[in-house]
């Protein structure tokens, strides 16, 4: 059996549609067949900082008090790399890159 395709779900960003992108990411995550695909969630804060988010954090994004959700400012930034076989994403902690994962497809609602 071959490895599952890894999808990077990228959402948020420096846009007036930030909250809508977050809500759309929740819907997309719910629709992805997790038996066939692995998902890496990457949120972009309103200030433009990229971060890895757990799938549980994404699933919990909701409208609250009439306000759309926001990607929080990250403690550690996510970075994109060109890997041996294509794209990779990693988390930068100080001067080190940790949790490096290959990515096959990027989906940005």
Locate predicted features.
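ATP-binding N-terminal substructure of ATP-dependent carboxylate-amine bond-forming enzymes
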Residues: 1-109
């Amino acid at each position: 059996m071959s490895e599952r395709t890894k999808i990077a779900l990228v959402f948020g960003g420096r846009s007036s549609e930030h909250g809508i992108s977050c809500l759309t990411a929740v819907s997309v995550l719910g629709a992805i067949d997790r038996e066939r695909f692995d998902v890496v969630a990457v949120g972009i804060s309103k200030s433009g900082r990229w971060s890895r988010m757990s799938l549980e954090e994404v699933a919990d994004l909701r409208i609250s008090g009439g306000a759309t959700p926001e990607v929080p400012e990250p403690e550690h930034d996510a970075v994109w790399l060109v890997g041996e076989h294509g794209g990779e994403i990693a988390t930068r902690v100080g001067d080190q890159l940790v949790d490096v994962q290959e990515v096959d497809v990027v989906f940005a609602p």
